[in-house]
Amino acid sequence: MENAARNLTSRNDDPAFWADADKHLTRYGPAFEDVIIERAEGSFVYDADGRAILDFTSGQMSAVLGHTHPDIVSTVNRQMASVAHLFSGMLSRPVVELAARLAALAPGLDRVQLLTTGAESNEAAIRMAKLVTGGHEIVAFAQSWHGMTGAAASATYSAGRKGYGPVSAGSFVIPAPNAYRPRFRNPDGSNDWQAELDDAFHLIDNQSTGNLAAFIAEPILSSGGILELPLGYLAALKKKCEERGMLLILDEAQTGVGRTGNMFAFQRDGVTPDIMTLSKTLGAGLPLAAVMTSAEVEQKAFEKGFLFYTTHVSDPLPAAVGVTVLDVMARDNLVQQAITRGKRLKDGLLALQQRFECIGDVRGRGLLLGLEVVTDRHTKAPGFELGAKIMEEAMVRGLSMNIVKLPGMGGVFRIAPALTVSDAEIDRGVEIMADAIVAAQG
């Protein structure tokens, strides 16, 4: 912030605002953008100059209905006028209705706990798995992100592990399959994910003390660079877990609620996890999360005294928002729209790949897509700096995108517009990306 070069004629250059920001805000991640966001609507956020910025990350990969959706605004106003927060042992109608609605959408996952954030829901899921199995060892992917709290942070390997002391005992990791950069290859050069998975679990078995509790996974690793688990992988992973008495936890923070073209990403594979967590997309940008599990697992947890009280567990306000999100998803056929709009966006990105050598790979599903930037398409040399320049040039032109930089990969853009995005907005975004690439390459 303090080193930002701002246009002195812009309302975004508010000296008092930036002085207070520099003085009082904790710097919790990368540098803040050099704009002041005053409002948001649909697929756009608007800065202090009134400039429309096309949001291709749905806020923090969450606003599946776009910003300030009128149905959500109406629900918040209505619920605030009745009851928003309760003692954690009290129930309200929105909580029970949302739990029933979610259970109907995910047969086999009949029990639901409503919380606030993805990290919190993963904490609850891991805690439940440890209690039910009697184990304490948790396995995750090397490119994972499950949150920044305790057990969730211990299962997060894509960033944020250095300098914080020991993680939870029994934290193990395996590589995620990467079709663009395979570690194990079939004779035709394609990714041999089964051999990779077998090898990984051989190492897990060697490390384990016999106390394996769960594997926690994202169906598409977002912060890991949009790495999609190939068809068949989840079934093989579930089998590995069953053979060892482990539970399979799926973290569908970003893939859940229609974004991939299924209501939940695991449904493409026909593999039901033992526990599923939802967050980001469930509240469409408001703080709502859920832990879903089978009646059998929940009964075992209950009998063993499962305890997970939090301040905002089962709050009626976010639950009412969740019900409205599901209503809008069904009414506006947004799961199907994720397929059709996703195809249009992916076709646009593939066209850019044909035009620009710096685009090494386009991947993902529905409206959760990735674009990997490289400096050499043949060697796949990472293009971190070029990717950062592209992101900057896109922002200047009115497109907000997010890029992740990980060891062994190029800079990967995570592209996830709202499910309500229009064809025209998709085309505009792709056009701005093309202009940004040209400008970044000089």
Regions found by a protein language model. Name each.
Residues 2-442:
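Conserved N-terminal phosphate-binding loop of PLP-dependent enzymes in the Aspartate aminotransferase
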